[in-house]
Amino acid sequence: MGQKVSPTGLRVGVIKTWDSRWYAEKQEYVKWLHQDIKIRKALMKELKGASVSKIEIERTKKEIVIFIRTARVGVVLGQEGKNIAKLVKLVHITIGDRKMEVKINVVEIKNPDTDAQLVANTIAEQIVNRASFRSVQKLAIKKAMKAGAQGIKTSVSGRLGGVDMARTEGYTKGTVPLATLRSDIDFALAEALTTYGQIGVKVWICKGEILSKELVSTSDEKPKFEKRDFNRSNNNRRDQAPKSHPVAKEAK
């Protein structure tokens, strides 16, 4: 069976960057990695209703900079930004180091209908609320295409509708080239915990192609090549008159 690689992992280092950006030695690497996992879990739990798509972390030995990408900036900031101090305190408790300097930057997602994580979370929430999994997917696809996406693909799997046997159903609209590395594919997973069991939700959204300036400038130019007439030698042979064969002289 063919195995499908993660579209995000395939493009990291090509057109996408890492969610955690730092360098550490062997002893600190494991410690910082576990801290990043705990920080993300704690912040996602605290900001459950704030439509948070992604949390990126940059750090040095003395400082941690956290970027929270959300569609609801006001909910994350709170009144006059009071919620930021609460989140900084939560990070200090999570990592167990109050001396570490923590900075939190909130980044607004201007088009939430084309963000794969937010779309997947919306589908999962509506499935939990007993909405039809087919109509929920169709509505999400309609909104994404209207918002400017070039293509979208959705998939839900599990005991859909409470049936005994689990199955997978999904829809696709537009172009979603998963094997083209220059295409910007946003991929996300979400889980819906229903009374019948767990239902998985996957969303792929194509936002177009990302090309470097060099590739864009040279792509319009037509390649130069020399025209060669491979039949020239054969034509010359045809035009030439056939050589007369020498006639053997009769012996007297």
Swiss-Prot record:
Annotated KH type-2 domain residues: 39-110
Any one GO cellular component localisation term in the record: cytosolic small ribosomal subunit
Renumbered residue ranges of the record's region Disordered: 218-252
GO biological process: translation
InterPro entries: KH_dom, KH_dom-like_a/b, KH_dom_type_2, KH_sf_prok-type, Ribosomal_S3_C_sf, Ribosomal_uS3_bac-typ, Ribosomal_uS3_C
SUPFAM superfamilies noted in UniProt: Prokaryotic type KH domain (KH-domain type II) (SSF54814), Ribosomal protein S3 C-terminal domain (SSF54821)
Protein name: Small ribosomal subunit protein uS3
Gene source species: Spiroplasma citri
The organism's taxonomic lineage, starting at the top: Bacteria, Bacillati, Mycoplasmatota, Mollicutes, Entomoplasmatales
